[in-house]
Amino acid sequence: MSDQNGEVNLEQVDVAVIGSGIAGLFLAVECARSGLKVAVVTKKEVSMSSTNWAQGGIAGVLDPNDLEGLESHVRDTLDAGSGLCDEEVVRSVITEASDRIRDLIGHGVQFDHNSSGGYDMAIEGGHSGARIFHTRDRTGAEIERALTEAASDETDTNLTILENWMAVDLIQRVHGDPVQGVSGVWCLSPEGVVWTLPSRVVVLATGGAGMMHKATTNPSIATGDGVAMASRSGADIRDMEFIQFHPTALHSNNPRPFLITEALRGHGAILMTIQEYSTWKTNGAGIDPSKHSFMVNYSPMGSLGT
């Protein structure tokens, strides 16, 4: 519908979520189930997210009473962060991980089990022990599947999903004054019409900006839209270099190279340069190949370092 100013308005919602990856869909489903009216705005199909491309898994200690395991996870994270981590945030995320993983399981995510019936825990870079929940090497796709189905269950009641709609900009309550917050978002419909989506709360869950780099394992939608909208609205931006960065990929001339899961290093893969590999093949009979890896110069964990 159009208002007296000629703007085309969507129905007001309690929460507008921009993005349909694990963060956006999880929040949208939880809010809808609590009785809030929610709209998810996603510029491609709902499953087109970086979450869907993620392979390895999710780190967490499922038993909240395993204090030693939790503390080990905290130490590993702080060590991997090289002094850049906010310890309070690290402890909060790791402590709450068990609840969030159980929530995902409750939403239908099927993590792999071992022959004993427990979860098949893997090791990845930076971890000193096996604490990675995974679904084969397609964990992200499994999470996206489950959350998409959970969202579909809510679409007839409190949840609306706007696929192929592009969030253009945040609507500030007072233009030029970020302290007053936002009152909605302008969206571009598939037909090229700009609509106003009024909302009590707007959540930016738009993922990373991998496409700004020459090579990235992110999908083509990772263009930093949410960060740009937040910046234009006066929000403080920090730590951009750490968003959605994956360290290992198969080299090619393709601008989006094939992602190599961190789980390979957990299973013993060694990071080596071509020269190091050649030296080991020529002179390394009987020598542990990890001794030739450049990673021994940077981390006591060798190829598991981050």
Roles of regions detected by a PLM:
Residues 15-40:
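N-terminal Rossmann-like FAD-binding beta1-loop-alpha1 element of flavoenzymes
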Residues 201-258:
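Glycine-rich loop(s) and the adjacent beta-strand/alpha-helix scaffold that form part
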Residues 1-15, 33, 180, 193:
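Extreme N-terminal leader/targeting segments of oxidoreductases
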Residues 105-193, 198, 205, 249-252, ...:
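Conserved redox-cofactor binding core of oxidoreductases
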Residues 235-306:
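An anion/pyrophosphate-binding glycine-rich loop and adjacent beta-alpha core
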Residues 80-121:
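Rossmann-like flavin
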Residues 60-93:
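Glycine-rich active-site loop/strand segments that organize a redox cofactor
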Residues 33-54, 65:
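Glycine-rich FAD pyrophosphate-binding loop
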